[in-house]
Amino acid sequence: RQRQMCIRDSGIIMPNLKMQKSDGRCAFLREDNLCNIHTIRPGICRMFPLGRYWEDETHFKYIVQKGECNKDNLSKIKLKKWLGIEGLAEYDSYIVRWHEYVKQLQAALPGLSEDNVKILNTFNLRVFYMTTYAGCADDKAFYAEFDRRLAMVKEKLGLM
């Protein structure tokens, strides 16, 4: 399995890619150092090794995370060029919407019992991670489906 679950300090469970135990490489990295899922890789992979520094609830800057990649002899690239990827504005908007939602979940957790936290985490994982985004052949379709799911979840959880 190429994924594992990570419980953040906030109590929200988020999946993350499992690295190979032998050398710390991504499980999707082939022997020729190319990505096995390149055409359908998640946004976090597209932006790697960039991270986000949140200035406030809706504004962030990209930062280079040093030491995050275990690959040797990395080529250097300017941050400005890296951020020149197609659809960056849409991706950034999606990240802000997701960040806002996660913050709402974090705010709700302290008032929930341990069992209800488990139910909430399971629901969140099923809706956003375990249910396929079938039919989403491009980013536009993915964002539309994500927004549909986000609206449904916020309504069910009373987070509107």
List PLM regions with ranges.
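Short, small-residue-biased leader/transition segments that mark boundaries at the very start
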Residues: 2-7
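Short loop/turn segments that flank or connect secondary-structure elements
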Residues: 8-160
